[in-house]
Amino acid sequence: MTTLKGRDFISLHDWSRDELEEVLELAMWQKARLKAGIRDEPLKGKQLGMYFAKPSTRTRLSFEVGIRQLGGDALFLSAHDLQLQRGESIADTARVMSRFLDGIMIRTFSHREVVELAEWATIPVINGLTDEEHPCQVVADLLTALERFGTLPGLKLAYVGDGNNVAHSLMDGGAKFGMHVVVASPEGYQPDPARVARAQVTAARYGGLVEVVTDPVLAVTGAQIVYTDVWASMGQEAEAEQRRKAFAGYQVTAELMRCAAPEAIFMHCLPAHRGEEVAAEVIDGPQSAVFDEAENRLHAQKAIMTLIMA
């Protein structure tokens, strides 16, 4: 654990496979102890500042409950609670927060804002979500897949829909574990080509594969994991109708799920829009792992906080 103390958690690309395996192993261990009624407090007396420029159900619940289960405490900060909106620099904000806190979780729009905060902070910074990446979510996804299948290398994960922040982090995470990640998106909504190329290099190193296609059936065929996300993310509401038309053939339906492996599970980072990116019979059906996945945000983030803040 000492090797990771003080580290930032901004992108899965920044962490080695061994380090991510340590996160997953600790998450499973802590989860088992919690279920057994054993309470560990490795973060006793520690304070986590949670800055939310974008609101969230799962991110706030999992971080706030998580650090309290670990013996620490959390301070919620909205955009209205800080002076950033009035022109105070990120550098000054980071240096001030570092004097009061033991860690910072930030959920915001600009990825550059998180990177800059980490550059100036003298305490660990955790990326709770940006428009470019969602690493904590994908650690929870990997944990869920590991629990279901017992291993990660060789699994095929098909992501159907918008090539957004979740798709970027799934490519990074899947590549690190030698998975076959296929993203199916319409032209104009595919993942960032530079991030695809980066993930492909990583995948080749670990015996995996990362692909981008336009055909959902091709992507899903034989997959153990079928994943989707909303078609219009927070801040894209004005594009909602345009996106509904673009993604009309990308809904995860029962018919599409039949193309996947017999043991396939369905995953979604939530919130979900039933009848848009996923049919109700899929997300509410027996193959759905979405609520296990949501719970695993708690366990994944507890492990991350323990490793970098204890």
From Swiss-Prot:
It holds the Pfam family OTCace. Keywords: Amino-acid biosynthesis, Arginine biosynthesis, Cytoplasm, Transferase. Its main location: cytoplasm. Pathway: Amino-acid biosynthesis; L-arginine biosynthesis; L-arginine from L-ornithine and carbamoyl phosphate: step 1/3. It is found in: Cytoplasm. It catalyses: carbamoyl phosphate + L-ornithine = L-citrulline + phosphate + H(+). Carbamoyl phosphate binds at S56, T57, R58, T59, Q83, R107, H134, P135, C136, Q137, C269, L270, R297. Belongs to the aspartate/ornithine carbamoyltransferase superfamily. OTCase family. Reversibly catalyzes the transfer of the carbamoyl group from carbamoyl phosphate (CP) to the N(epsilon) atom of ornithine (ORN) to produce L-citrulline. HAMAP family: OTCase. This is Ornithine carbamoyltransferase. It comes from Symbiobacterium thermophilum (strain DSM 24528 / JCM 14929 / IAM 14863 / T).
